[in-house]
Structures are given as C-alpha cells and as structure tokens.
C-alpha cells in the first residue's frame, strides 16, 4: 500500500545549484505562454493544449493551484534556473570588497545568481493508468543541452521513491524525441515500447525502486555512458 504523501517543505525546493522548483503562480502566465509559442517546444509535445494563449495558460495555472492542495506531493512545478552574475560586475565588486569599499552583505548580493523561468517539471498520475505516476519536464529551448533535465528528474524520482514510497515510476515522450529518451535512460528508465498516452502513441519507459537504488549509486558520468550504449 502506498503511504500518504508527506508534506513538502516550504518552496522553493533546491534540485541542484542550478535549479530550483516551486508552485506555479498567476505571475507565471506570460512566461508559460511565451514558452509554448516556441515552435521547437510545440514540436516535442504529445498533447495539444493551447498553452500559448494567455487565457488558457492562466486557467491552467489556476487549476494547478487547486491541484496542489487536493493532491499533496504531486504536481507540475515551475522550474527556475540560476544565471550567474555578469563577470565584469562580479570582478569589480570583489575588488571593491577587497579594498573595503563594500561589505560582505553587498558582495553576497552581487554574487547571488539571478533565478529565471526555465519551464516545468512534473510528477503526476498517468491519465491512462491513474494508479501509476509519471515524471515529465518541459523546458525553454535556452535551457536545453545542459544538465537541468537530469537535475530535475533526479529530484522528481527522490520524491516518488523516497517521499511517496512508490514501487515504480513511468516516463513518456514522443517516439521521435531522442533527447528525451536519452534523458530517461540516464535517469535509469528502461524502454517498454509504445503505449497509449493522452489519445496518442508515445514511447513508454519504466523505472522500478530496486533499479533506481542500484542505478543512482553510480556516478553520473557512468550513467551517461551506459545510457548511450543502451541506445
């Protein structure tokens, strides 16, 4: 039997030095709609909800606010990525600190990263099999190509296995989305073939608790190498 979901600590939740998560709020509407206007994002989707329209994005976020309270421990969370301070500004501030012109608090303020909207990460029930959970991510293209998807995916899996006590978790992606499939393999998932997903066919991946425990003892570089070989 799956235990009741323990409450999450107060947001934002740190997934890594580069990534933090929080609940969506009304002020995220424009960022959410803007992300979905990008044809590179839309090309990867296996649903057709018109989130590029601000009114639809606003209703979606309002629904999430209710979802968070009705389904504690699961949800679609806003991802914020850290952008480092300008190098020249930082160097100037550090010199000023060394010269005694600014104090520690002001230097720390300059050194702090800027947190900017990066997309979302999700841990939700599978629509076609509500007893199961799936992880997902949707990121702005300027956040692609790094390790944010892995950082967020590992946070979601810790939540699913350690926080919620799940025995397995699923992942889905467009069959043509090789980048998403690779990310799922690096996280430890294994492909199971095609499966129905929101009225479409999607590539399905599965990860069990025992494999998760073994896989995530490996350094990430080893997981990357093994996932590439498995593909």
Predicted segments — roles?
Residues 1-142, 159, 163-172, 187-231:
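GNAT-family acyltransferases
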Residues 28, 147, 177:
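Conserved G/P- and acidic residue-centered "switch" motifs that form tight phosphate/ATP-binding loops
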Residues 116-118, 134, 148-151, 182:
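Generic recognition of short, well-ordered alpha-helical segments
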Residues 143, 147-156:
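Conserved acetyl-CoA pyrophosphate-binding loop and the N-cap/start of the following alpha-helix
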Residues 150, 176-192:
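Conserved active-site alpha-helix within GNAT-family acetyltransferase domains
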């Amino acid at each position: 039997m799956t235990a009741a979901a323990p409450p999450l600590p107060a947001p934002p939740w740190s997934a890594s030095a580069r990534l933090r998560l929080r609940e969506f709020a009304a002020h995220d509407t424009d960022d959410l709609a803007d992300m979905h206007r990008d044809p590179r994002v839309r090309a990867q989707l296996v649903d057709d909800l018109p989130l590029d329209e601000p009114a639809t994005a606003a209703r979606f976020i309002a629904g999430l606010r209710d979802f968070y309270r009705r389904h504690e421990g699961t949800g679609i969370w806003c991802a914020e990525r850290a952008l480092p301070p300008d190098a020249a500004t930082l160097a100037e501030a550090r010199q000023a600190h060394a010269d005694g012109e600014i104090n520690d608090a002001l230097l720390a303020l300059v050194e702090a990263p800027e947190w900017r909207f990066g997309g979302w990460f999700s841990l939700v029930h599978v629509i076609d099999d509500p007893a199961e959970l799936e992880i997902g991510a949707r990121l702005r293209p300027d956040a692609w190509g790094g390790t944010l998807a892995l950082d967020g995916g590992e946070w979601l899996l810790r939540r699913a296995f350690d926080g919620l006590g799940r025995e397995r978790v699923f992942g889905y992606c467009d069959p043509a989305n090789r980048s998403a499939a690779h990310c799922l393999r690096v996280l430890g998932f294994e492909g199971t073939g095609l499966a129905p997903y929101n009225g479409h066919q999607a590539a399905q991946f599965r990860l069990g608790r025992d494999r998760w425990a073994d896989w995530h003892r490996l350094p990430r570089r080893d997981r990357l190498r093994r996932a590439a070989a498995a593909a």
